[in-house]
């Protein structure tokens, strides 16, 4: 007897029909889970490739931003840089989410409070070299947030891929074999009853024929 098989099921034709229906539904569910897992893996690989490209660009941006701020320091002096840095705008990160195949993917939005370093103020009062540095580092910060967002997405996708795999394995290796075994046992019992009934009827028929003779 297979482990986990429910032998309390009544061996009737209705139960056989129900069990076979459950097998079909389980197989359909398994196909859907496999399709979902494939879609999640595809999304995972796409985001992974995107992150690799973003990190390569980020390294270049860091080098460029550092070079630009060095130039600004030489042209305008370190004191001017510190004065502008102390006036820097505050930034806020808003966390939202989107749904991909049932997985919540975090989305991060960066907003800046430009009440001090407004575009107008920067155009009039901030030297071009320092203003260029500000823009570069703002973009650097924004790109870094995007990478963090996508890495969090990868983490969530990976967990869902693992959950989907476990569910698929449970259906494929436990549920379906158990249902198929139950259907087999019910069918064997029904066939045996049918043979017994046929044998009994045949015996009765012979007795009736013998009595008539």
From Swiss-Prot:
Entries under Pfam families matching the protein: ATP-synt_D
- Which parts pass through the membrane? none
Cleavable signal peptide: none
Q: How does it sit in the membrane?
A: Peripheral membrane protein
InterPro entries in the cross-refs: V_ATPase_D
Keyword Cell membrane tagged = yes
Tell me the GO molecular function terms. Answer: ATP binding; proton-transporting ATP synthase activity, rotational mechanism; proton-transporting ATPase activity, rotational mechanism
Cellular location(s): Cell membrane
UniProt key word Aminoacyl-tRNA synthetase: no
Sections of the chain in a coiled coil: none
Name the GO cellular-component terms.
plasma membrane
Q: Which GO terms describe its biological process?
A: proton motive force-driven plasma membrane ATP synthesis
Major location (coarse): membrane
Q: Which UniProt keywords apply?
A: ATP synthesis, Cell membrane, Hydrogen ion transport, Ion transport, Membrane, Transport
Q: Which PANTHER family match?
A: V-TYPE ATP SYNTHASE SUBUNIT D
The UniProt family comment states: Belongs to the V-ATPase D subunit family.
NCBIfam families listed in its UniProt record: PRK00373.1-4, V_ATPase_subD
Q: What does this protein do?
A: Component of the A-type ATP synthase that produces ATP from ADP in the presence of a proton gradient across the membrane.
* Subunit-level organization: Has multiple subunits with at least A(3), B(3), C, D, E, F, H, I and proteolipid K(x).
Protein name, as recorded: A-type ATP synthase subunit D
Look up and give the organism this protein is from: Thermoplasma acidophilum (strain ATCC 25905 / DSM 1728 / JCM 9062 / NBRC 15155 / AMRC-C165)
Lineage per the UniProt record: Archaea, Methanobacteriati, Thermoplasmatota, Thermoplasmata, Thermoplasmatales
């Amino acid at each position: 007897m297979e482990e986990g098989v429910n032998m309390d099921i009544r061996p009737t034709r209705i139960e056989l029909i129900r069990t076979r229906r459950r097998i079909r539904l389980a197989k359909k569910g398994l196909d859907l889970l496999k399709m979902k897992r494939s879609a999640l893996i595809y999304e995972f690989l796409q985001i992974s490739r995107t992150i690799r490209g973003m990190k390569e660009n980020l390294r270049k941006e860091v080098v460029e931003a550092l070079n630009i701020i060095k130039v600004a320091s030489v042209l305008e002096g370190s004191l001017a840089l510190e004065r502008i840095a102390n006036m820097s705008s505050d930034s806020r990160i808003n966390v939202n989410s989107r749904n991909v195949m049932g997985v919540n993917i975090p989305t991060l939005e960066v907003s800046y409070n430009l009440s001090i370093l407004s575009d107008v103020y920067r155009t009039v009062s901030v030297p071009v070299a320092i203003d260029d540095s500000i823009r570069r580092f703002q973009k650097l910060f924004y790109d870094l947030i995007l990478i963090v967002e996508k890495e969090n997405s990868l983490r969530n996708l990976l967990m869902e891929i693992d959950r989907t795999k476990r569910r698929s394995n449970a259906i494929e290796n436990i549920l379906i074999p158990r249902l198929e075994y139950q259907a087999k046992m019910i069918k064997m019992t029904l066939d045996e009853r049918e043979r017994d009934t046929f044998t009994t009827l045949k015996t009765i028929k012979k007795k009736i024929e013998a009595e008539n003779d």
